[in-house]
Amino acid sequence: MNEVLFGSKNAERVLIYIYSRREGYAREIARFYDTDLKSIQNQLDKMEAGGVLVRREVGRTRPYTFNPRYSLLEELKGLLEKAFSFYPMNLRQELVMNRPGPNAKDSSS
């Protein structure tokens, strides 16, 4: 939808995913969009090198989040908010639905 602004479809996917879920890691993002893991990892690496994203170590995963020190963060989030509003409702709902982690307990038992 906005690949022209973001540079590529996968760059847009990475940014929208992290915008809507607050964080994400390469395999999770690639799986969500059913796309190539290497392409997503390349985008994450570029955005980390450019200071847009930061990565932290959590066990064996390395989730990425927006870099709070990125000088255009508020403007970027405003643009992403607007872009997100044009996504189909079903995709927006899937993006904001947070799945429990692998060690989460089922509270219904």
Task: Name each region found by the language model.
Residues 18-21:
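Short helix-capping/hinge SLiMs at alpha-helix to coil transitions
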Residues 2-11, 25, 58-80:
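Short, cationic-aromatic polyanion-contact patches
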Residues 48-58:
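A short, conserved structural fragment
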Residues 12-16:
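Pre-recognition alpha-helix immediately N-terminal to the DNA-recognition helix
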Residues 71-109:
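Amphipathic alpha-helical dimerization/coiled-coil segments
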Residues 23-32:
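Short acidic, hydrophobic short linear motifs in intrinsically disordered regions
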Residues 44-45:
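Short, hydrophobic-biased segments on the C-terminal half of alpha helices
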Residues 38:
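Key DNA-contact positions within bacterial/archaeal DNA-binding proteins
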